């Protein structure tokens, strides 16, 4: 009851008249029916959304990544078609849905029309991203890098290839993947 009083908005969707119909349809779906912020927006101490809208959030032992225009930790470098493919099939050449996101695809987004999925893509790509940047690389001769290279070669190259580009529709590309570069790669 208290959470509803503080955070629940019992009001109809109001379109942004400065945006086109497709953007507003995307906003309606993201903010309402698909409720993306429930997982992808960090919460405050009493469970309300923080101002970091769609900029990623920890959910128990899962991390829901940033889904904004940030080109490093978000989906800003994805094309609208890659977003549509991800939401429809659960994978594209950049990422593979797993955990709660796989459930969202299986139970919800795969059933949306291509037009609705494209509207979601347009809306998400318009959202301001966090100020997170790509972390600084360690020197190649650093012991941690050598150990990581060995672990990758032994455990990852069969599916993700030696250059990290993956196999389309089977193993996601790890190169420049926001889920890997983001603040929490546990998912």
PLM region descriptions:
Residues 24-27, 84, 118, 175:
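Generic structural signal for individual residues within well-ordered alpha-helical segments
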Residues 1-20, 62, 81-146:
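Post-cleavage N-terminal segment of exported redox proteins
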Residues 2-5, 14, 18-44, 49-56, ...:
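Sequence/structural segment immediately N-terminal to covalent heme-attachment motifs in c-type
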Residues 43-81, 100-113, 166-187:
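Gly/Gly-Pro-rich "capping" loops immediately C-terminal to redox-active cysteine motifs
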Residues 30, 94, 170:
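Short, electropositive, low-hydrophobicity segments enriched in small/polar residues
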């Amino acid at each position: 009851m208290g959470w509803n009083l503080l955070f629940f908005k019992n009001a109809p969707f109001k379109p942004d008249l400065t945006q086109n119909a497709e953007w507003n349809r995307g906003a309606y779906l993201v903010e309402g029916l698909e409720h993306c912020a429930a997982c992808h927006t960090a919460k405050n101490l009493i469970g309300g959304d923080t101002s970091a809208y769609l900029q990623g959030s920890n959910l128990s032992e899962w991390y829901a990544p940033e889904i904004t225009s940030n080109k490093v930790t978000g989906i800003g470098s994805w094309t609208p078609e890659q977003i549509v493919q991800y939401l429809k099939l659960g994978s594209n050449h950049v990422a593979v849905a797993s955990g709660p996101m796989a459930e969202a695809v299986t139970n919800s987004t795969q059933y949306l029309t291509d037009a609705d999925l494209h509207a979601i893509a347009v809306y998400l790509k318009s959202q301001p991203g966090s100020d997170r940047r790509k972390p600084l690389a360690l020197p190649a001769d650093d012991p941690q890098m050598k150990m990581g290279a060995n672990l990758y070669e032994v455990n990852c190259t069969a599916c993700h290839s030696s250059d990290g580009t993956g196999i389309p529709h089977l193993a996601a590309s790890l190169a420049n993947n926001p889920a890997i570069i983001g603040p929490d790669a546990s998912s």
